Amino acid sequence: LAMICDSTNVFSLGKAGSELDVRKSMLNIMSGLKKRIIIASFASNVARLETAFYCAEKTGRQISLVGRSMHRIFKAARQCGYLKDVIEPVDPRDANKISKDRIIYLCTGSQGEPMGALNRIANEIHPDVNIESGDTVIFSSKIIPGNEKKLYALQNSIVKRDIEVITEENAFVHVSGHANREDLKDMYQWVK
């Protein structure tokens, strides 16, 4: 018998944070925002997608998925029985018809990828989504080492347009999906 596990956060002491705690924090943040909200996250983080949908519903907003992998993961999650009870997403082409205080865009590009949806939105080359002064972009992810330069450049370009940027550095909007050291110790104890 062999056990193989993820050790990405083995050097992070204590236990990993809870998605439920992030959900509460993000709901609190979003409840106070008056214009468009753009959330950039890893599409593969289905729990974070569920958090975004939960916050959209609780704040009376529609949600629109932007980016191919966001659509692909959403569809796969539904096929596997996840995200069954969330509100139906709005097509990005129709989202511009919704009042600015009633829409959340959940998009790819949280690492500043040149072809990611957020980069295309920020550079005003996305065919369906635009942002403007007073909107808020939430980076609901951690910076992967090596992506700092392009991600800070993206964030700076957004801020220069008078758009608020919220990151894990200035608000509680992300917990890792990887187990911390104490979580790993617990797991090894359970399987002994």
Say what each PLM segment does.
Residues 1-192:
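Acidic/His-rich, metal-assisted hydrolase cores and their charged scaffolds
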